[in-house]
From Swiss-Prot:
Organism listed in the record: Campylobacter curvus (strain 525.92)
Recorded name of the encoding gene: mnmG
Subcellular location: Cytoplasm
Protein name, as recorded: tRNA uridine 5-carboxymethylaminomethyl modification enzyme MnmG
Gene Ontology biological-process annotations: tRNA methylation; tRNA wobble uridine modification
InterPro entries: FAD/NAD-bd_sf, GIDA_C_N, MnmG, MnmG-rel, MnmG-rel_CS, MnmG_C, MnmG_C_subdom, MnmG_C_subdom_sf
Cellular component terms (Gene Ontology): cytosol
Length: 619
């Protein structure tokens, strides 16, 4: 019987980050996956990042994860979304060469010390006395471990739908994992059923690109990873097409063949990424819908039709596709489909992503009810880190809501749960002005270094930015700028409005029109600073009032977070708490007063009552 410190089941985006984190933290790690060639496969669109998702990738990178580095290495188009808006809601996004992404990740894992890969199907979770002891595979192999991380994506009891046709699979051409799903149920974990879908892939030579809108990458593309240097990718264009009334009529006339409407699909799909038939049904007043035409590889021989997710029959997919301008002769290489799969209700988890009922069992990714590569990778990284920390008898790394989008993601899952695929949005973060993409390295890089996932050179660069920021703000907040003739001429030379009274330099820099190039001319200290430091200084100046407000809110939140709810605390018998509130508190077992306040249905009045009783119990 082989023994490992950590075993990861599933080679998707969550499994990759979990495996790498555990192995790099010195733990003997095994990754079990159904098909080794598909490690790191992009099952849906060939892109990483986006609004809020880009934040997650930057945070993964700051903690020492891999997703951003690989994206930089194999990306074929890079854009910053919402660039004209404030820094809190900007999102980096990259089109990736999905084939090279897989090869890059697989080779990286194969060459990582302490990490082994085995192509098998995990069939049974082994435990004794509510403690993980190992895992069994379809080959009859038994691997012993005390830390098991399940990252199975859509493979748990996966069922693919195309029209009336159904196929048991975790992805087209790959087996689903049926026994493992039952094994999780046998452990007493509450489970549910979700649904997602994917779009058709089209032969490039059958598309008329001349009638499509061309969408280029940014002229000055920015890397995802702080560790990427000398970044100059060769970029490819994407394209935009539109559905029309003919397309919509074809879809409407085939609603009776749509598994989504016939009752064939039972799982709940993602609210914010609906299928094309769902869009036509819900938004019947719209005369067209955007379709984003995205290359799948650098060779651009196959294109993904983003916005065209469907589970309609194959012949209907062909008809509706060929009704779109530019696709009159299009040939489908890979059809779209819907897939149902089992998931574990995430309120079964602690904030460490360890299950409450079984010690040493961690869950990450779509098995927890999320959707998206980035959400999965973030959870995988945290599960791998916390499994390794637990082996060393150290406290888990639990990121707060004011520290990271990863903290928001996990806190939402474990305190509120989800009944539909959960995806990240900037609106979910109360303190999003503090959780920007640009400061992820400053927020989380220290953790990455402590864990041994960030090297000395990278850590030194991060700390230099921190020093530059402090020094720059000191200069701007303390030095005065008078309306002297020389200063007024200086402002005019920068194409800035003049001043009539003495102000600090910070007031000048806080102007919306003030750029990093202008900042370089303001004082000798800024002249040769790196762009990352300058951007930090500019943002802190421009949004200083709002940042201060959010920091005050955080201080109040920390006071509440510090009030811990004792283990095995009895909520019954507390006067003033309704039966509904008591049942929710018992079900979720929040560790702190703040965690209790995050549970849906727990009122501020209930929190006040609970606070009083906790203090009384501690006397």
């Amino acid at each position: 019987m082989d023994k490992f410190n950590v075993i990861v089941v599933g080679g998707g985006h969550a499994g990759i980050e979990a495996s790498l984190a555990a192995a790099k933290m010195g733990k003997k790690t095994l990754l079990i996956t159904i098909l080794a060639e598909q490690i790191g496969a992009a099952s849906c669109n060939p892109a990483i990042g986006g609004l809020a998702k880009g934040h997650l990738v930057k945070e993964i990178d700051a903690l020492g994860g891999q997703m951003g580095l690989t994206t930089d290495a194999v990306g074929i188009q890079f854009r910053v979304l919402n660039e004209s808006k404030g820094p809190a809601v900007r999102g980096s996004r990259a089109q990736i060469d999905m084939d090279r992404y897989r090869v890059y990740m697989r080779n990286l894992l194969l060459n990582t010390p302490n990490l082994e890969i085995s192509q098998e199907i995990a069939t049974e979770i082994l435990s004794a006395n509510e403690q993980i002891t190992g895992v069994k595979t379809h080959l009859g192999n038994v691997y012993e471990t005390t830390k098991l991380i399940i990252t199975t994506g859509t493979f748990l009891n996966g069922l693919i739908h195309v029209g009336f046709n159904k196929l048991k699979a975790g992805r087209v051409g790959e087996l689903s994992s049926i026994n493992l799903s039952q094994s999780l149920r046998n452990l007493g974990l509450e489970m549910g059923r979700l649904k997602t879908g994917t779009c058709p892939r089209i032969d490039a030579k059958t598309i008329d690109f001349s009638v499509l809108e061309r969408q280029e990458g940014d002229a000055k593309p920015a890397a995802f990873s702080f560790r990427t240097q000398h970044f100059a990718p060769e970029q490819l264009p994407c394209y935009i097409a539109y559905t029309n009334e003919t397309t919509h009529e074809i879809i409407r006339s085939n609603f009776d063949k749509a598994p989504l409407f016939t009752g064939q699909i039972e799982g709940i799909g993602p609210r914010y990424c609906p299928s094309i038939e769902d869009k036509i049904n819900r938004f019947g007043d719209r005369d067209r819908h955007h379709l984003f035409i995205e290359p799948q590889t650098r060779e651009a021989s196959e294109y993904y039709i983003n916005g065209f997710s469907t589970s309609l029959p194959y012949d209907v997919q062909v008809a509706m596709l060929r009704s779109v301008r530019g696709f009159e002769n299009a040939r489908i290489v890979r059809h779209g489909y819907a897939i149902e799969y089992d998931y574990v209700v995430p309120t079964e988890l602690k904030h460490s992503l360890e299950t409450k009922k079984v010690r040493g069992l961690y869950l990450a990714g779509q098995i927890n009810g999320t959707t998206g590569y980035e959400e999965a990778a973030a959870q995988g990284l945290m599960a791998g880190i916390n499994a390794a920390l637990n082996l060393d008898a150290k406290d888990p790394l639990v990121l707060r809501r004011d520290e990271a989008y990863i903290g928001v993601l996990i806190d939402d899952l474990v305190t509120k749960g989800t009944k539909e695929p959960y995806r990240m949005f900037t609106s979910r973060a109360e303190y999003r002005l503090l959780l920007r993409e640009d400061n992820a390295i400053l927020r989380l890089g220290g953790y990455g270094r402590e864990l041994g996932l960030i090297d000395d050179e990278t850590h030194a660069r991060i700390e230099q930015i921190r020093v530059n920021l402090a020094k720059g703000l000191e200069i701007l907040n303390t030095r005065e700028f008078t309306p002297s003739k020389q200063n007024l001429e200086f402002l005019a030379g920068l194409d800035e409005d003049v001043i009539s009274e003495k102000v600090t330099l910070q007031k000048i820099v806080a102007r919306k029109s003030f750029t990093s190039e202008k900042l370089r001319k303001l004082d000798a200290f800024f002249e040769n600073l790196d762009e990352a430091s300058l951007e930090q200084i500019l943002t802190e100046c421009k949004y200083s009032h709002y940042i201060a407000e959010q920091k005050n809110q955080i201080d109040k939140m920390k006071d509440m977070m510090s009030v811990k709810i004792p283990e095995n605390f009895s909520f019954r018998g507390i006067s003033g708490l309704s039966n509904e509130v008591v049942e929710k508190l018992e079900k979720f077992a929040p560790p702190t007063l703040f965690a209790a306040s995050e549970i849906s249905g727990i009122t501020p009045a209930a929190i006040d009552i609970l606070h009083i009783y906790i203090k009384m119990s501690q006397r």
